[in-house]
Amino acid sequence: MGGFIVFAIILLSLRQVFKVKIHNAMAEISYTLFGIIYVSYLFSHILLLKYEFPNGNILVVMTFMLIWACDISAYLVGMAIGGKIFKHRLAPKISPKKSIEGAIAGILGVFLVILSFDKIYLFIANFVCGISFLTKTCSVNYDYVAIGGLKAFILALAIGVFAELGDLVESKIKRELEVKDSGNLLLGHGGFLDRFDSALFVLPIVYYFMKYVAYL
């Protein structure tokens, strides 16, 4: 990663040298480098989850299930009672529609899914083995680290908080750059980062939780 960043700095600097426009060179280099580090480094934790733990594929799937549980719970509760209990919005200047009620619901939604992790894990493991039955092999390891009680609450709280932070940071970046969407790759869905902004912050959280906390 360090070598890649150095190479990127050299290329970006050379590009600025040969540009006719000489203003805002540092700003352009800084924005580009931030984008490279922000997206590539944070999202690279998906590979760490996949390859550093038994059944990494299943762990990645379950991580995205937690993100979706957080997003869906926050959205539904926010639409239903957002602003009715807590009058102050979560971050009114950055994302006016986000409510404190929705944020709390996101944490609770993640917590409930984590408590069902053992059943979900076995379901996915059996599904993977069912697919691999045609090749008469099953590479799934059924060893599972139960996450319950205080650990489950800590993980749910961390995912709920950092999923919201991921959304807010991406919204802040778009407002700073005065763009509506983060790209046009996913038409009708706001852009690539609009779909994965939560994941960028949550993937590292889950990785370090599994590495340093889950097995305690």
Predicted features along the sequence, with ranges:
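Membrane-embedded alpha-helical bundles of polytopic integral membrane proteins
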Residues: M1-L157
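Acidic (Asp/Glu-rich) catalytic motifs at the cytosolic membrane interface
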Residues: I67-G83, K87, A91, P96, ...
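Short, conserved aromatic-histidine micro-motifs
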Residues: N126-K136, H189-G191, F196, Y215-L216
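A generic structural signal for well-ordered alpha-helical surface patches
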Residues: K151, S171, V206-Y207
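Juxtamembrane boundary at the C-terminal end of a transmembrane helix
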Residues: Y208-L216
